[in-house]
Amino acid sequence: VFFYANGALDFLIFEPLARGYRFMTPEPARHALSRAFDNLALPIIFANDLLQLRFHHAATTLSRFAINSTGGVLGLFDVAAELGLQPHDTDFGQTLYAYGVGDGVYLVLPLFGPTTARDAAGLGVDSLFDPRTWLLGSSERLALYTGEGVVRREELIDAVNYLTENAESNYNAVRAWTFQQRNTELHQ
C-alpha cells in the first residue's frame, strides 16, 4: 500500500517539482546544491565513522566538514576533495551491519520509500545525530528537508524513468534494486 501511495505522491508532487527544478536550475547550480546537502550530512557520517571504529574515516569526514563549510562556502564547493580528502558515506544502518545485525524484513516507509527493518531503525538514530534536528525549528527543518528531497529526486529522474519503463513489476524491481544498492554500499 505504501509503495503505491508513495508512487502516487511522486507522480503528482515530487517528480513535477524535481522536473521543474531541473528545468529552472543550471546544472552547475544543481551540483553545488547537492554538494551543500552532502555537507550537511557529514556530522551524521562522522558519528557513524566513530561508532564503526573507523577513525581514519572519521578524521577525513571531520576535515571535509570543516574545510567545505568554510572554504567551500557551506559545502557549495568541494574544496576538500581538491585537497585529496575524498568523500565516503555511511549511516547507522551500516553501523548496525558492522556489528552483525541482519537486514530484517523489507519495508516501504511513507515518504522515505523502500528500506529494511535495520535501515529503518538506522534512519531514526541518524536523525538524532543530525544537528538540524536539534538546532532548527520544525518549519525550518521541514523547508530544508523538502529542498533536499527535491534535489535528491532530481538526481534520480532518469533512473526512475528507466526502471518504470523497463520493469515488468515496479514493486519487484524496486525491491531488488534496494537490496542490490544496499549490498554495494555495505561492502565498500
Listing of model-derived features with the role each one plays in the protein:
Residues 8, 46-50, 177:
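Amphipathic, soluble alpha-helical interaction motifs
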Residues 94, 99-188:
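A structured, mid-to-C-terminal "fold-capping" secondary-structure block
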Residues 1-11, 15:
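Mature N-terminal segment immediately following signal peptide/propeptide cleavage
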Residues 12-28:
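Membrane interface segments of multi-pass transport proteins and intramembrane proteases
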Residues 31:
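A small/polar active-site loop signature that marks catalytic segments
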